[in-house]
């Protein structure tokens, strides 16, 4: 399927067919949104950021539908490059009268140097999308060197590790990042360059229902999210602080129930 999708994106005659297919898949959802809620509610419930410089309600609704199509295309296309596992942030849309700028961050788990290939693919996609937005479209992918520099990317990364590695669990993941935390934090915060951005804390919440129907929540805070740990001293952290009743190792709903992971990251400059 990935090869077929790539061939369609490389063939200009088939580009519109691909986008039409995505539009048809989301058509029912978009119709429900347009009929049941107003554009202000839509903008608050979307999974992306959108900055518009026109106030036509019909245009706003059309842009939201186009953005919904675009965000799904990005997730699919970023993992079409051979030998890559990509995690992307929530795209940011800046819609002007004559142009649309789409910016997003991505993290490559395989650390392959294929930034040029991704840029070329985004340029081809921009040309196709310009027909749907009826204006110039520019897509700006920005590579991130560290997975913990965006909360959405970090969340998807944790979920991927838990669901694809039988030897991985939350204890191992969090302990590995706790050990790295002293290296992430500057030795002397007051003497650091103000332009340097560093991770100062995280909050990770696992929330869901067990197989017996009981609700459970486990919350893990460290660094600036923990008022009792202002000095970021790793020696004061108990070894079992990340163990909870929700076990994400074996993804058997009947046995273990369902759960969600929510990550918040805090940075200092």
Curated annotation (Swiss-Prot):
GO cellular component, one term: ribonucleoprotein complex
Protein name, as recorded: Small ribosomal subunit protein uS3m
Subcellular location: Mitochondrion
Keyword Ribonucleoprotein attributed: yes
Function as written in the Swiss-Prot or TrEMBL entry: Essential for mitochondrial protein synthesis and required for the maturation of small ribosomal subunits.
Natural source organism: Monosporozyma servazzii
A molecular function (GO) term: structural constituent of ribosome
BP terms from Gene Ontology: translation
Keyword Mitochondrion attributed: yes
Alphabetical keyword list: Mitochondrion, Ribonucleoprotein, Ribosomal protein
């Amino acid at each position: 399927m990935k090869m077929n999708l790539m061939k369609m994106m490389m063939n200009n005659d088939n580009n519109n067919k691909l986008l039409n297919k995505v539009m048809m898949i989301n058509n029912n959802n978009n119709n429900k949104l347009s009929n049941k809620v107003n554009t202000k509610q839509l903008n608050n419930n979307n999974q992306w950021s959108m900055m518009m410089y026109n106030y036509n309600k019909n245009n706003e609704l059309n842009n939201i539908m186009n953005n919904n199509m675009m965000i799904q295309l990005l997730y699919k296309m970023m993992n079409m490059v051979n030998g890559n596992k990509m995690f992307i942030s929530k795209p940011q849309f800046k819609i002007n009268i004559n142009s649309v700028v789409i910016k997003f961050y991505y993290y490559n788990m395989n650390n392959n140097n294929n930034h040029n290939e991704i840029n070329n693919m985004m340029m081809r996609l921009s040309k196709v999308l310009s027909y749907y937005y009826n204006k110039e479209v520019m897509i700006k992918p920005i590579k991130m060197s560290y997975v913990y520099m965006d909360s959405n990317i970090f969340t998807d990364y944790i979920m991927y590790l838990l669901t694809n590695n039988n030897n991985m669990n939350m204890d191992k993941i969090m302990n590995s990042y706790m050990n790295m935390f002293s290296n992430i934090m500057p030795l002397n915060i007051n003497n650091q360059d103000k332009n340097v951005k560093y991770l100062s804390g995280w909050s990770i919440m696992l929330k869901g229902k067990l197989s017996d129907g009981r609700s459970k929540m486990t919350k893990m805070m460290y660094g600036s999210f923990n008022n009792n740990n202002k000095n970021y001293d790793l020696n004061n952290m108990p070894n079992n602080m990340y163990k909870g009743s929700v076990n994400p190792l074996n993804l058997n709903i009947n046995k273990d129930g369902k759960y969600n992971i929510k990550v918040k990251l805090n940075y200092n400059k």
